[in-house]
Curated annotation (Swiss-Prot):
Protein name: Succinate dehydrogenase assembly factor 4, mitochondrial
Keywords carried by this UniProt record: Chaperone, Mitochondrion, Transit peptide
Subcellular location: Mitochondrion matrix
This protein's record includes keyword Chloroplast: no
InterPro entries: SDHF4 (IPR012875)
Quaternary structure annotation from Swiss-Prot or TrEMBL: Interacts with SDHA in its FAD-bound form.
Residue ranges of the region described as Disordered: 31-108
Gene Ontology terms: cellular component: mitochondrial matrix; mitochondrion
Organism superkingdom: Eukaryota
Principal subcellular localization: mitochondrion
Annotated function: Plays an essential role in the assembly of succinate dehydrogenase (SDH), an enzyme complex (also referred to as respiratory complex II) that is a component of both the tricarboxylic acid (TCA) cycle and the mitochondrial electron transport chain, and which couples the oxidation of succinate to fumarate with the reduction of ubiquinone (coenzyme Q) to ubiquinol. Binds to the flavoprotein subunit SDHA in its FAD-bound form, blocking the generation of excess reactive oxygen species (ROS) and facilitating its assembly with the iron-sulfur protein subunit SDHB into the SDH catalytic dimer.
Length: 108
């Protein structure tokens, strides 16, 4: 086989394969195969739905953004541990270097 005939032979083989692929018998068998898989594709689509999962640690109810109950005031508004009058009612707010109250944070 000469090198000049090789491209012609390759084009002839691909054209013959294309004609065979477009034959009515082959198209009919492809349609029949794809229609028989139609029922299977519906089953696959149904199985892709996620199952119900248990509620996770970070899944919070809708009303979680509401503020929790505020801490009770000290008697006579004086902290019995630090003897501070009118101070914070919870743990020391500056223990991490910033003051946080009702979602507002002020860095010292």
């Amino acid at each position: 086989m000469t090198p000049s005939r090789l491209p012609w032979l390759l084009s002839w083989v691909s054209a013959t394969a294309w004609r065979a692929a477009r034959s009515p018998l082959l198209c009919h068998s492809l349609r029949k195969t794809s229609s028989s898989q139609g029922g299977k594709s519906e089953l696959v689509k149904q199985s892709l739905k996620k199952p119900k999962l248990p509620e996770g640690r970070f899944d919070a109810p809708e009303d979680s953004h509401l503020e929790k109950e505020p801490l009770e005031k000290f008697p006579d508004d004086v902290n019995p541990v630090t003897k501070e009058k009118g101070g914070p009612r919870g743990p020391e707010p500056t223990r991490y270097g910033d003051w946080e109250r009702k979602g507002r944070c002020i860095d010292f």
